[in-house]
């Protein structure tokens, strides 16, 4: 008669539980050792009792086996992440490709190409899009033209202001030059007679550089022909010649 099936549940009796733990622990360690020897497998076994006591077995060392385990887990995780990222990029590329093809079809339709497969409703939508685009283009053109006109008006106002300033400057300079010309004319025509000597004042410095001042003694000399001189002497009143000589003497 065989053994009955043992029900798997926690053993309430503390002593029985400790005895069962010791027996099965030893059996598990033995099985792990046998597996590593018979199958040339790298086996690591870690057991903690209910009191926290550690029992372990490692055919190649617990630390080495754990490092190998972590390395395999991380590589598998990295591989899974790389695979997931690759799939995500592939789906994204597929979406972008489909969107690009749709944009190309729309562009051809807007240019009046490949209109055969379109239905009446699609053609009406295309017509509305073209009308909207044409309206926006006209509005933009009008806006640019208005901006250009405003810019030209602004430049016109600036040029007008510059013209007024130049005109005012020329008027000021013209009045100044006229005043200087009149002053120079008065200087050229004015003569100072003092002590029987007539001294003509020279023009300003700029004119004085071109001509030298002249000093005239006596009355201004005028060329008179011989006949006229004889007539003047005959018709001159008495004492006029004496006055003329006195002018030279003085």
UniProtKB/Swiss-Prot annotation:
**Classification via CDD domains:** MADS_MEF2_like
UniProt note on tissues of expression: Expressed in the floral meristem. Highly expressed in lodicules. Expressed in palea and pistil. Weakly expressed in carpels, empty glumes and stamens. Not detected in lemmas.
Signal sequence extent: none
Provide the GO biological process annotations. Answer: cell differentiation; embryo sac development; floral meristem determinacy; floral organ development; floral organ formation; floral whorl morphogenesis; floral whorl structural organization; integument development
Q: Name one GO molecular function term.
A: DNA-binding transcription factor activity, RNA polymerase II-specific
Cellular-component GO terms for this entry: nucleus
Protein location? Nucleus
Q: What phenotype is described for loss of this gene?
A: Abnormal and almost sterile florets. Mosaic organs and disturbed identities of palea and lodicule. Extra carpels or spikelets.
Chief place where the protein resides: nucleus
What InterPro entries does the entry give?
Answer: MADS-box/MEF2_TF, MEF2-like_N, TF_Kbox, TF_MADSbox, TF_MADSbox_sf
**One Pfam family it belongs to:** K-box
Q: Which PANTHER family match?
A: SERUM RESPONSE FACTOR HOMOLOG
State whether it acts alone or in a complex, and with which partners, per the record: May interact with the K-box of MADS1, MADS5, MADS7, MADS8, MADS14, MADS15, MADS16, MADS17 and MADS18. May interact with MADS13. The dimer composed of MADS6 and MADS18 forms a ternary complex with histone fold protein NF-YB1.
Q: What does this protein do?
A: Probable transcription factor. Regulates floral organ identity and floral meristem determinacy. May be involved in the control of flowering time.
Name this protein carries in UniProt: MADS-box transcription factor 6
């Amino acid at each position: 008669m065989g053994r009955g099936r043992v029900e798997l549940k926690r053993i309430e009796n503390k002593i029985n539980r400790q005895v069962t733990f010791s027996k099965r622990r030893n059996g598990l360690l033995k099985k792990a050792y046998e597996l590593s020897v018979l199958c040339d497998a790298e086996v690591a076994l870690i057991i903690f009792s209910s009191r926290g006591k550690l029992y372990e077995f490692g055919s190649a060392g617990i630390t080495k086996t754990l490092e190998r385990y972590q390395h395999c887990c991380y590589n598998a995780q990295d591989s899974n992440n790389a695979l997931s990222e690759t799939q995500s990029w592939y789906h994204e590329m597929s979406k972008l490709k489909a969107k690009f093809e749709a944009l190309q079809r729309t562009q051809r339709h807007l240019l009046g190409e490949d209109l055969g497969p379109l239905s009446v409703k699609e053609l009406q939508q295309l017509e509305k899009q073209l009308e909207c685009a044409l309206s926006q283009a006209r509005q933009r053109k009008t806006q640019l033209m208005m901006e250009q006109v405003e810019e030209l008006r602004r430049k016109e106002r600036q040029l007008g202001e510059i013209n007024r300033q130049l005109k005012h400057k020329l008027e000021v300079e013209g009045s100044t030059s006229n005043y200087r010309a009149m002053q120079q004319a008065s200087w050229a025509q004015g003569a100072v007679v003092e002590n029987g000597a007539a001294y003509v004042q020279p023009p300003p410095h700029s004119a004085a550089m071109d001509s030298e001042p002249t000093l005239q003694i006596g009355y201004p000399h005028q060329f008179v022909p011989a006949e006229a001189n004889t007539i003047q002497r005959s018709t001159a009143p008495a004492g006029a010649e004496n006055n003329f000589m006195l002018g030279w003497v003085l």
